[in-house]
């Protein structure tokens, strides 16, 4: 049974190798020109896609400095209000009192309420069960 399954796969691999040797590559080497299209025709044909290697977006030509400038920084009046708002929101979330929405979420998520101080004493059975 194993030989039956492997034979078609091996034949397909051999066929792909033969096709690869006889056909030319779909990706020409960089710097080589396609003989079917002269250089003047490449630039004039608007329907032909732009080659990435010759475009200005090529990483060899483009850098962040070209887009934003060498010493670009965001102005403080854009950064400071957002930073202050986020800090105030985090402080409010930490310091606010528990609401009905918090109790509902705790019930939905199935969390157990925090134990009271007296159940944390080592001699109580509730504290013993919580540790094991």
From Swiss-Prot:
Subcellular localization: Mitochondrion inner membrane
Species of origin: Pongo abelii
The keyword Electron transport belongs to this UniProt entry's keyword annotation: yes
Identification of the protein by name: Ubiquinol-cytochrome c reductase complex assembly factor 4
Annotated segments matching region Disordered: 24-73, 110-132
Superkingdom, natural source: Eukaryota
PANTHER family: PROTEIN CCSMST1 (PTHR35268), UBIQUINOL-CYTOCHROME-C REDUCTASE COMPLEX ASSEMBLY FACTOR 4 (PTHR35268:SF1)
Function statement: Required for the assembly and stability of the mitochondrial ubiquinol-cytochrome c reductase complex (complex III (CIII) or cytochrome b-c1 complex), a multisubunit transmembrane complex that is part of the mitochondrial electron transport chain (ETC) which drives oxidative phosphorylation.
A Gene Ontology cellular-component term: mitochondrial inner membrane
Known partners and oligomeric status: Forms a complex, named COMB/coordinator of mitochondrial CYTB biogenesis, composed of UQCC1, UQCC2, UQCC4, UQCC5 and UQCC6; stabilizes nascent cytochrome b/MT-CYB and promotes its membrane insertion. Forms a complex, named COMA, composed of UQCC1, UQCC2 and UQCC4; activates MT-CYB translation. Forms a complex, named COMC, composed of UQCC1, UQCC2; UQCC3 and UQCC4; mediates MT-CYB hemylation and association with the first nuclear-encoded complex III subunit UQCRQ. Complexes COMA and COMB are bound to the mitochondrion inner membrane by UQCC4.
Signal sequence coordinates: 1-15
Family, as annotated: Belongs to the UQCC4 family.
Topology Mitochondrial matrix: residue spans: 16-78
Family matches, as InterPro entries: UQCC4, UQCC4_vert
């Amino acid at each position: 049974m194993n030989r039956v399954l492997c034979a078609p796969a091996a034949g397909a691999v051999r066929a792909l190798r033969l096709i690869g040797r006889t056909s030319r590559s779909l990706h020409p080497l960089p710097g080589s020109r396609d003989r079917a299209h002269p250089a003047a025709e490449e630039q004039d044909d608007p329907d032909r896609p732009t080659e990435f290697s010759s475009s200005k977006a090529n990483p060899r030509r483009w850098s962040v400095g070209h887009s934003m400038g060498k010493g670009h920084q965001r102005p403080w009046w854009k950064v400071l209000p957002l930073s202050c708002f986020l800090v105030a929101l985090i402080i409010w979330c930490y310091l606010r009192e528990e609401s009905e929405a918090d109790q509902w979420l705790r019930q939905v998520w199935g969390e157990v309420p925090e134990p009271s101080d007296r159940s944390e004493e080592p001699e109580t059975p509730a504290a013993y069960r919580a540790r094991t």
